[in-house]
Regions:
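Conserved acidic/glycine
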Residues: 1-48, 54, 243, 247, ...
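Cofactor-binding active-site loop characterized by glycine-rich and histidine/acidic residues
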Residues: 24-28, 34-164, 182-188, 193, ...
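A general secondary-structure junction signal
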Residues: 66, 237-239, 319
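Short acidic, gly/pro-rich beta-turn/loop elements at beta-sheet edges
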Residues: 72-74, 180, 245, 314
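Glycine-rich ThDP/TPP pyrophosphate-binding loop and its adjacent helix/strand module
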Residues: 109-306
Length: 322
């Protein structure tokens, strides 16, 4: 049994519920034609995001990828602002200019998602260099998928971070597929984290990325190592996305049996059972959290739908840094 504090465990449950319910609601809005642009969902990957994020300090920084909804929520984005952003509204966290694939929240330390595969890696290295030069004590976490590790920028970013001993964690959420390509057909190493050896930095493997406690405890060790001035770490967490690569992907390259097998490893249900069986929380407590999250998600939709679209003159706003 874990020795983690009850409040932390309940926060894990709440955050994962927020990710699941927000993404399923956004998927409904996509089908209604209310969401401009492409969307990529984090359903099934909740533990891999939440366990990592709760191991950080609130003022630590992250860079995200195209599948950034879960990371944004886990980092503490305002749900109203997020939903408004995804619907392209002026009240969104990026004033409707970012949308789903470029969701960002600088107030929460989220430097932004990125529509380019691996695009956040160089940004993370720059942010980590900034923290090192200013001696802030903050660290940076770069989120990316398994497919991004075959991009040239992966080598460039990890190599530079290792040379300069930067306070950055490279975090690969391995869901097994780069769009429709099985990762086993795309790389010759058994596990992504083994690539750390080429750069002389530690590699960490979280085998069950659907166990939020395992993710948290593993990630916390890496956070303490990096914050201690020891340089970067490469972490791999194995999980699975329940939905297609994007809102336009029917997922025909996977069998129903494979998807159902992973659904039996539901990270939220796993934590719910753990909390109840170990008498950490009652079913009623968890149901109350679920009800409040559902209410907050519905409120975010109402806020977003009632918000205005950006005025034409806003196209000339935020071009330069103040």
């Amino acid at each position: 049994m874990s020795t983690l504090d009850k409040n932390l465990l309940l926060e894990m449950f709440r955050k994962m519920e927020e990710i699941r319910r927000m993404d399923l609601k956004i998927a409904q809005l996509v089908k209604k034609g209310k969401v401009p642009g492409m969307t990529h969902f984090s359903v099934g990957e909740e533990a891999a995001n939440v366990g990592a994020m709760l191991a950080l300090n609130p003022d630590d920084l992250i860079t995200s990828n195209h599948r950034g909804h879960g990371q944004a929520i886990a980092k503490g984005i305002d749900l109203n602002g997020m939903m408004a952003e995804i619907l392209g509204k002026y009240t969104g966290t990026c004033k409707g200019k970012g949308g789903s694939m470029h969701i960002a929240d600088l107030d929460a330390g989220n430097l932004g998602a990125n529509g380019i595969v691996g695009g956040g890696m160089g940004i993370a290295v720059g942010a980590a260099l900034s923290q090192q030069m200013q001696n802030t004590g903050k660290i940076v976490v770069c989120f990316f998928g398994d497919g991004a590790t075959n991009e040239g920028v992966f080598h460039e970013a990890v190599n530079m971070a290792s040379i300069w001993n930067l306070p950055v964690i490279f975090y690969c959420i391995n869901n097994g597929y780069g769009i429709s390509a099985d990762i086993k057909k795309m790389t010759n190493v058994e596990h992504i984290h083994q690539r750390s050896a080429a750069y002389g930095i530690p590699g960490m493997f979280i085998e069950d990325g659907n166990n939020v406690i395992d993710v948290y405890e593993g990630f916390k060790k890496a956070v303490d190592y990096v914050r201690g001035g020891n340089g970067p770490v490469l972490i791999e967490s194995v999980t699975y996305r329940w939905l297609g690569h994007s809102s336009s992907d029917p997922g025909k390259y996977r069998t129903r049996e494979e998807v159902e097998l992973w659904k039996q490893k539901d990270p939220i249900e796993n934590l719910r059972k753990y909390l109840i069986e170990n008498t950490i929380a009652s079913a009623e407590e968890l149901e109350e959290i679920q009800a409040k999250v559902k209410e907050a998600v519905e409120a975010s939709v109402k806020f977003a739908e009632e918000s205005p679209f950006p005025p034409l003159e806003s196209a000339f706003e935020d071009i330069y840094a103040d």
